[in-house]
């Protein structure tokens, strides 16, 4: 059933792309040129997808993207990945190996996918000592958190509905967290760090709020290990996903940015070095689906 629906969506998207690709490419090129021309003076610049923007602009632009896609975010994840994102997230939480007594910060937690898996994993583990656990779901976009909280209520995964586990939802910037030093035993961020302006600051803040022995884990789109497969994946990403976003969510530009941000993100080894530079030890990564995504892990020792 899922395969049939996904195939139908892909077919519709491919037909739709022929009516939009040429004009959209022209608009993107114009936007990139005008964006570059408008940047003057000494203010630092960064990338927003393939565009060059002022650092002060990127946060607002990313915020606007997720405001636009919040209500359709989970549906689009299923459509874009043909449902495989569910498997990636399951593996991610299994690699974390939640235990009772853990204090987790789920950064860029948005609509709650990682947190809900964490809570269900805990529920399946015996807890004879009744050790209390906690998770803080944090995101820079309040709209995404609102969607997540409503999902939690429907799924029966709120503090009132759980035993020996509390859940908090808090809007926060990953680059300047409002939490005390050494306040969490684990930090997760899934498909969020590439949207941040200063990845080094995000990693530094993650290190700060973790307790000694705490674990940092990141699930993020990455780069395929085979050049031919990377080319095929790029064709799918750029030719299918934006029109699919238009068909299902009425958002071409938002999903154009998302695929561009994936291509701009550092390769696995480079990101591994960035995690090490933030102070983490025993840093490693694991490729899933030939490197479409990678799980990065490090410890604060």
Swiss-Prot record:
**Would you tell me the protein name for this molecule?**
2-methoxy-6-polyprenyl-1,4-benzoquinol methylase, mitochondrial
User: Chief localization class?
Assistant: mitochondrion
User: Which family, according to the similarity comment?
Assistant: Belongs to the class I-like SAM-binding methyltransferase superfamily. MenG/UbiE family.
- Ranges of Polar residues compositional bias? 20-31
Describe the protein's quaternary organization and the partners it interacts with: Component of a multi-subunit COQ enzyme complex.
Which organism encodes this protein?
Answer: Drosophila melanogaster (Fruit fly)
Q: Which InterPro entries match?
A: SAM-dependent_MTases_sf, UbiE/COQ5_MeTrFase, UbiE/COQ5_MeTrFase_CS
Metabolic or biological pathway, per its Swiss-Prot or TrEMBL entry: Cofactor biosynthesis; ubiquinone biosynthesis
Cell compartments where the protein resides? Mitochondrion inner membrane
Lineage, top ranks: Eukaryota, Metazoa, Ecdysozoa, Arthropoda, Hexapoda
Q: How does it sit in the membrane?
A: Peripheral membrane protein
Q: Where S-adenosyl-L-methionine is bound, by residue? A: 111, 139, 173-174
Q: Which UniProt keywords apply?
A: Membrane, Methyltransferase, Mitochondrion, Mitochondrion inner membrane, S-adenosyl-L-methionine, Transferase, Transit peptide, Ubiquinone biosynthesis
Q: What does this protein do?
A: Methyltransferase required for the conversion of 2-polyprenyl-6-methoxy-1,4-benzoquinol (DDMQH2) to 2-polyprenyl-3-methyl-6-methoxy-1,4-benzoquinol (DMQH2).
The protein's annotated catalytic reaction(s) are: a 2-methoxy-6-(all-trans-polyprenyl)benzene-1,4-diol + S-adenosyl-L-methionine = a 5-methoxy-2-methyl-3-(all-trans-polyprenyl)benzene-1,4-diol + S-adenosyl-L-homocysteine + H(+)
Write the Enzyme Commission number(s) for this entry.
Answer: 2.1.1.201
Q: Gene Ontology terms, cellular component aspect? A: extrinsic component of mitochondrial inner membrane; mitochondrion; ubiquinone biosynthesis complex
A GO BP term here is: ubiquinone biosynthetic process
Disordered, as annotated region: 20-44
